[in-house]
């Protein structure tokens, strides 16, 4: 055993171990005071990288939750505004329905129209002023907007809000065929009703017999309107080309029912003799007669069957014939036949493609019901059009020109609900507008539900990401307290060991005494 004075190996070892203990004690105190296991990169280089990534992800998820909540707020604002617009449209339709009966006079219809104008202005005011953070929501400008709903780029939800102003909603496609003058069997097919599929309807006979005619065809079309999106109205009205003259009608027949001779008919049928004779057999003919404001005879089919009226040219008791031509030039002595006009309405404004069967091209049309190419009256109207006057094109397309006699007058349909037919057009427009807004709201509801699901998911994800970061970054106090106690004891024992190592050197002095 060697004894040295210049180098105290035991003291040096004790000092070195004391330094290690002091460093570990310092790190332990740092962790206990900060609550973090990783306070600097040297503590855990790879763990710090992962923890920082998780922290960034958690913070981004927090902002994504805020973004999604903002998006839901926007949708809720738009949804409530459109809910109010739909209530306005309900009122417009009710007022149009109120105007669509001839118990209303011109003044009452004008009052209803004034109410409707105000309501449309209110609807437009909502559409133009509903906004979020300076962005209008219902003008059509809020389209294809994106909301970041994830921690990483391009994790988005898109939302669009369609226009809800009167010039963009309520589009209605109105189509009316020409007057039908030929009988026959009709079997219709509506082409590409949903853009792809065709819908074929049962066949209907067009004639003057009961249980036939455009009235039955309209019922068949309306029965299938859920599949086709098309509704139909049959207008079968025969009108004399001129006012009723003083005279007589010989051997008068309507739809095969003989009425006989009618004598002493006065001008404009002022005493109602002709109308009374015709209406006496309404149950057999299915035809109702009346005179209009200018003294013309009008025959209306009450069930939509065709109308055939005929009288001999022979004068009775020297009296001239009270009627000569009807329906734009049809001679009563040869027989005037009219099967009416079929009006079709589609509330999404797409073209109505109607043909005779699945093997006929859509462009061919179907002449038997008046829809041959070039012979139909087509137009599209929207809610904004209700504010002004419906023009002659709308009048014809809506079926208000029941026959050539009325069409030749080139009249307009008036403003909004100021006429019976105009009121019915407004009813269709209001219903179409309601459906359009309901579709927009339905789409927004789906987007909002998507956002709710996303928020629920990323909220849980954020919690789990923070938990994962905590596992890496945060200190385990129980474990670290044990480490601190160990290092504290080692520091104290190290100091004692160094003191003893220095004392050992004094034993050399005993060798010198």
Swiss-Prot record:
Keywords attached to this entry: Bacterial flagellum, Secreted, Virulence
Cellular component GO terms held in the UniProt record: bacterial-type flagellum; extracellular region
Pfam families for this protein: Flagellin_C, Flagellin_IN, Flagellin_N
One function term, GO molecular function aspect: structural molecule activity
Localization per Swiss-Prot or TrEMBL: Secreted; Bacterial flagellum
Entries under SUPFAM superfamilies matching the protein: Phase 1 flagellin (SSF64518)
Subunit structure and binding partners: Heteromer of FlaA and FlaB. FlaB is located proximal to the hook while the remainder of the filament is composed of the predominant FlaA.
Known function: Flagellin is the subunit protein which polymerizes to form the filaments of bacterial flagella. Important for motility and virulence.
Family of the protein in this entry: Belongs to the bacterial flagellin family.
Name under which the protein is recorded: Flagellin A
Source organism per UniProt: Helicobacter felis (strain ATCC 49179 / CCUG 28539 / NCTC 12436 / CS1)
